[in-house]
């Protein structure tokens, strides 16, 4: 098991209910507890990236990086990301969650919510900077590998992709491991896979992938 030093600056393990829990420093977003020092609990059961940290999956994140986050929803995970990252572009296609994101961003000036479809990066290419250090994708749709390939254009040559693959969003009938293999095969058209690990302890039928662009 990796030591907690693998966590980015701005993410700490602190005591909640006499247990060591992941936290970031910031305002409460989804009803999570917050200690007297301003550190709020990061619930790995509600966040795939949080689950990756709990499972000691090495992401390479150190804190302060520029982020393009696809599938931001109402901000559960991306709010924690913005607590420790640099400029964080949050892409979400549904208007209702974006309204929540705008509220989250009021206390996080580095968080930039965008009402856009991650499958159509041309709709936000004029806003998102190039040479982004991390592309983090958590999109519940078919064609998850295609989304990652289309958004590779924003990554710096030495940037990284963190992809949460949801097997049931691709195919509800096939064995999840077969679905993962198919997606990984497509992903290799534009990425070099560094890590793949299932998240079943926290999220059924999900696979975490860390990759670098194959340029």
UniProtKB/Swiss-Prot annotation:
One of its GO terms (molecular function) is RNA binding. S-adenosyl-L-methionine binds at residues 76-77, 92-93, 117-118, 138-141. Keywords: Methyltransferase, RNA-binding, rRNA processing, Transferase, tRNA processing. One of its GO terms (biological process) is tRNA processing. The keyword rRNA processing applies. Its EC number is 2.1.1.-. Residues 11-20 have a biased composition (Basic and acidic residues). Pfam families: Fibrillarin. Residues 1-29 are annotated as: Disordered. Belongs to the methyltransferase superfamily. Fibrillarin family. Interacts with nop5. Component of box C/D small ribonucleoprotein (sRNP) particles that contain rpl7ae, FlpA and nop5, plus a guide RNA. PANTHER family: FIBRILLARIN (PTHR10335:SF17), RRNA 2-O-METHYLTRANSFERASE FIBRILLARIN (PTHR10335). Involved in pre-rRNA and tRNA processing. Utilizes the methyl donor S-adenosyl-L-methionine to catalyze the site-specific 2'-hydroxyl methylation of ribose moieties in rRNA and tRNA. Site specificity is provided by a guide RNA that base pairs with the substrate. Methylation occurs at a characteristic distance from the sequence involved in base pairing with the guide RNA. This is Fibrillarin-like rRNA/tRNA 2'-O-methyltransferase. The gene is flpA.
């Amino acid at each position: 098991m990796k030591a907690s030093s693998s966590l980015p600056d701005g993410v700490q393990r602190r005591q909640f209910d006499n247990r060591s829990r992941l936290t970031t420093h910031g305002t409460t977003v989804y009803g999570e507890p917050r200690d007297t020092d301003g550190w709020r609990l990061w619930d790995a059961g509600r966040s795939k990236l949080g689950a990756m940290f709990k499972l000691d999956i090495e992401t390479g994140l150190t804190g302060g990086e520029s982020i393009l986050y696809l599938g931001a929803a109402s901000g559960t995970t991306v709010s924690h990301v913005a607590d420790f990252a640099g400029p964080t572009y949050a892409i979400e296609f549904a208007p209702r969650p974006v309204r929540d994101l705008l509220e989250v961003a009021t206390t996080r000036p580095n968080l930039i919510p965008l009402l856009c479809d991650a499958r159509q990066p041309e709709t936000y290419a004029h806003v998102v900077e190039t040479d982004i250090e991390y592309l983090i994708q958590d999109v519940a749709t078919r064609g998850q590998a295609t989304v990652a390939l289309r958004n590779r254009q924003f990554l710096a040559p030495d940037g990284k992709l963190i992809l949460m693959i949801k097997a049931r969003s691709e195919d509800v009938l096939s064995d999840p491991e077969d679905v993962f293999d198919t997606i990984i095969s497509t992903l290799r058209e534009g990425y070099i896979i560094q890590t793949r690990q299932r998240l079943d302890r926290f999220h059924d039928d999900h696979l975490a992938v860390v990759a670098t662009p194959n340029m």
